[in-house]
Amino acid sequence: MKITSTIPAVLLGLAPLSAAVSVSGSAEGFASGVTGGGDAEAQIPSDIDELKEWLTDDTPRVIVLDKEYDFTESEGTTSGTVCASWGTGSGCQKIIQDDCGDSPSSQATWYTAGTTGIDVASDKTILGDGDKGVIKGKGLRFRDGVSNIIVQNIEISDLNPEYVWGGDALYFDGSDLIWIDHVTTARTGRQHYTFGYETNTRITLSNNFINGETTYSTGCDGYTYWTFEMVGEADQITLQNNYIYMTAGRSPALSGGTLLHAVNNVWEKNNGHALEGGDAGARGIFEGNAWIGVSTIVGDYAGRLFNAPDSSSAGDCESALGRACEVNAVSDSGDLTAYTDTSFFSDFSGLTIAPATSATDAQSSVPNNAGMGKL
């Protein structure tokens, strides 16, 4: 009797292993409708080799990360010349580069794994279990036409943070229908998010914690400069409910032909500038956001921009979003210059638009709910 009564208990104990972790909610904004690995059985990779194999194969998968997967030393080290382009202090980043010009140069060694991300194949869901799912020392790449991918509730961190070109956390270059949600990125060698020149369509970045606090930075002060690089030819990106903390620039760098809807994000502690961008083809609507302790909200920017500066202009969003915009909020920051260009609003036609709450609501909720472990 003891044996037969124990078997069901064991089975009941094992059953939730794969079933307990599942996608929370659904994508809003441009990536609406993404399914990732769909109803594939959830599986936990045993080590970094199995994780990499599952991420890159052609099989639709739901991959659950229940521990730290440390790639740091997995590919050995590389040595070469680095340049002290921003100073020689202990907190200054150096750049991996052969020609240093007038900057001091030295030899250095870094971990090879961090410099190139794992190429994630189509139809994948990557989920963290609670606050345990960490990929350390290597990022993820979405390129060459991959589509239908969900990444939720994980951390990607520690990609040679001392060296520019040490590694991107998340890299997109020719991808479609991708949802990155409740992901924490920290201590990257270069960008937290890089969008390359090939077009990336139907992308939603939501509820993520971009932790810019770092030991090494271009300002030698612990604030990362390398945040979002958006240079795609015709990218479509929803930036929703993200907490962007301790940055100094590229927050984002909105360039190329990118179409951006930035809604209900919170920037806090930026000692440089948030928005920048050098291309006239870039377009962005910023609504319901909060900037707290941001020295300069808009730096050098060449594109078209609407930032809902007041309630009288918010109604202009109706033609782009199907509703009025939420007004942005600023505290302990530089001035929010009014940008009210509506000439690109028709470009939102046919896209799914993320909902918005007030900037006040975002300011109180986003910092406490963004990132891994906050589902």
Swiss-Prot record:
One of its GO terms (cellular component) is extracellular region. Residues 1-20 form the signal peptide. Gene3D superfamilies: Single-stranded right-handed beta-helix, Pectin lyase-like. Its EC number is 4.2.2.10. Its main location: secreted. It is an enzyme of class 4 (lyase). It catalyses: Eliminative cleavage of (1->4)-alpha-D-galacturonan methyl ester to give oligosaccharides with 4-deoxy-6-O-methyl-alpha-D-galact-4-enuronosyl groups at their non-reducing ends. The keyword Mitochondrion does not apply. Disulfide bonds join C83-C100, C92-C220, C317-C325. The keyword Lyase applies. Keywords: Carbohydrate metabolism, Cell wall biogenesis/degradation, Disulfide bond, Lyase, Polysaccharide degradation, Secreted, Signal. GO terms for biological process: cell wall organization; pectin catabolic process. The active site is at R250. One of its GO terms (molecular function) is pectate lyase activity. It is found in: Secreted. Pectinolytic enzymes consist of four classes of enzymes: pectin lyase, polygalacturonase, pectin methylesterase and rhamnogalacturonase. Among pectinolytic enzymes, pectin lyase is the most important in depolymerization of pectin, since it cleaves internal glycosidic bonds of highly methylated pectins. Belongs to the polysaccharide lyase 1 family. This is Probable pectin lyase C. It comes from Aspergillus oryzae (strain ATCC 42149 / RIB 40) (Yellow koji mold). The lineage of its organism: Eukaryota, Fungi, Dikarya, Ascomycota, Pezizomycotina.
